């Protein structure tokens, strides 16, 4: 069984109700490959989750951009995994580099979040990736392996995990990892999973790429053997997101 292509759209902290309705209209009218070719998940800000869930076409799914590390309670401003499950939100993005950098989320904290979200029945897009300094010092794989290990130490069943490799230096900067750079890290990450989790998990877990993915570079990136899709930032708010979804065809035609 091949790994189904996965395209996630991370809207980050963007949008008004009117803008969200426009994006939904574009997505709902789009002619894209069927669900057996590509899995599409969009991740609006919390306040728009019910609107998007109710209005989005049924073959696309919805993700939250974060959730709390344990059961709800006296944690002002947080949203628990149980609340997302209660709203039938199937996916959550955890460990995004912006949260690691701006909010100080450690590898261990992200690992705990992933484990708790999975335990409540959510599917998780778990983000890993290195900074420019780390890449230039040659420590990319050490960093990515440590981030992945913190998840592997806490998670036994990887069925509902998608790993998103997002080189921090390529997020929102217009810089993009070359197809060869992306493939190299994805292949090394898969090798790490094979050695430290299991060959089965390595073969079946989707590793997607994030970092300035757009309509112009998505086909070449998506054609790499270990790139199983994308986590798209800014471009997911634009019509070119449709072109990125269509890049799934490169795998079907390979």
Curated annotation (Swiss-Prot):
Keywords: Cytoplasm, Gluconeogenesis, Glycolysis, Isomerase
Enzyme Commission no: 5.3.1.1
Gene3D superfamilies: Aldolase class I
Molecular functions per Gene Ontology: triose-phosphate isomerase activity
InterPro entries: Aldolase_TIM, TIM_sf, TrioseP_Isoase_bac/euk, Triosephosphate_isomerase, Triosephosphate_isomerase_AS
Active-site feature positions: 96 (electrophile), 166 (proton acceptor)
Primary location group: cytoplasm
EC top class named in words: isomerase
Record Pfam families: TIM
Classification via SUPFAM superfamilies: Triosephosphate isomerase (TIM)
Any further remark recorded for this protein: In plants, there are two types of TPIS, cytosolic and plastid.
Family affiliation: Belongs to the triosephosphate isomerase family.
HAMAP family reported for this sequence: TIM_B
Listed name of the protein: Triosephosphate isomerase, cytosolic
Species for this entry: Petunia hybrida (Petunia)
Gene this chain is encoded by: TPIP1
